[in-house]
Amino acid sequence: LHSKDLVNWSIISAAVPAALPPVTTPERPEHGNRVWAPSIRHHNGEFYIFWGDPDQGIFMVKSSRAEGPWSKPVLVKEIKGIIDTCPIWDEDGKVYLAHAYAGSRAGLKSVIAICELSADATQVIGPSRIIFDGHEHHGTCEGPKLYKRNGYYYVFLPAGGVATGWQVVLRSRNIYGPYENRTVLAQGNSPVNGPHQGGWVDTPTGEDWFMHFQDVGAYGRVVHLQPMKWIDDWPVIGTDKDGDGCGEPVLTYRKPDVGKTYPVCTPQESDEFDGYTLSPQWQWHANINDKWAYYAGDRSMVRLYSYPVPDNYKSLWDVPNLLLQKTPSDNFTATMKLTFRPNPKYKGERTGLVVMGMDYAGLILENTEQGTVLSQIACRKADRGGTEKTNDSVAVKDSTLYLRVKFSADGSKVKGTDDLLVRCNFSYSLDGKKFRPLGETFQAREGKWIGAKVGTFCTRPAIRTNDGCLLYTSPSPRDRTRSR
């Protein structure tokens, strides 16, 4: 994502556009694995992104331009359990890396450590030293971001849990401590639960701001921008009404003063498929396979080839060739135009519009013995092996249809949680004008450490042949409203 004012953002590139190394399971999604809490930094004319893979180790990519191309991932250290990595280049030329530990892999969590890197930041050259133990007062501390200001080293970190926690700042005159600590941001009386995993940004005009996320369930991690100032070399974030040094999040505030005014823009959403590559908002469900799709920009379409479902397939949770994107707003409508041309020799080829998460639902076209059938399906607990249930279906003769899902949220919460209650209603049309509802209202659910996504797919049973069905897709512009 790129912005010149911290408010208007667009997607400009993917630092790892294809496959994450080492490619151990290229034909199956790895839910909740691989890239955990990356950090991006700029040093000596180059951008660096570091991340921890809890099963593989510490990785880094770099580029002279944020738009790319980015280097191939470098394995900085092969190790299991290190996550949430963030580098700093010190004035004496030394390079350090702050990180946390994943309890599920390392057998230890709620501590923050620092290690030294080589001058080119391509390898770890010293042992990790624990510089903060949060077990007593700041359990589940993670996501450190490392800075230096006025002779102090600062570590910004969240603690207390993703949806329920707070922001802590450590400071010390020595990189390895001892560190003082202070809680600098908590929910307080605001509706922003668990302000989590934030970073400090200073502007060319001398202002300080803090970006963090809020976990709201099916809509994923929503980014917030908070005002920040320094008092006695401690950051004060949000609004500190009682003057105790711990602020609470604001919902509205003036824009940052960056010296100029920039046009309003939002991350890309709609797509007419008029290019020869996918627009940057699209994400495959697993490492990319070039045989999944053909991009025909001159015809404003993308053609998805039916691809065999994996061995031991239970649901779309197991399918790699889902083409998805994140939800753009609280309330919006997504419409997709597609043409389904199944191979008449094979039954069971499927395509459609899907809302994907640990529970999922969608409008599914399937080639059956009785012809093409459009069904509204839902799958509960897909992450635990759940299977699909058909709520309603109708026979269709037209090969081209418009499929639609309307997302609605009124601020209500899922019982017993801070998650927004998100309702999805499905409909279809033969002409793109008159839409007919189909099936039942679906309550969207998040994925593994991500929000729900919306998109399409094209599959067939495990028939090994190069003669599958074709799917032509071209979505119409999406109607959307923002309540956030």
Positions of the model-derived regions?
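Hydrophobic core segments of beta-strands in well-ordered, beta-rich domains
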Residues: L1, E30, V35-P54, M60, ...
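Blade-edge beta-strand/turn elements of extracellular beta-propeller
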Residues: W9-P26, K62-I79, S118-G139, L170-S190, ...
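Carbohydrate-binding surfaces in secreted/extracellular proteins
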Residues: F273, M336, L403-L438
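Extracellular glycan-recognition surfaces and repeat-rich motifs
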Residues: P280-Y305
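Secretory/extracellular carbohydrate-interaction modules
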Residues: N312-T372
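Short, aromatic/His-centered strand-loop micro-motif at the edge of beta-sheets
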Residues: K381-Y402
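Flexible glycan-contacting loops in extracellular carbohydrate-active proteins
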Residues: F435-T465
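Conserved small/polar residues in nucleotide/adenosyl-binding loops
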Residues: Y472-T481
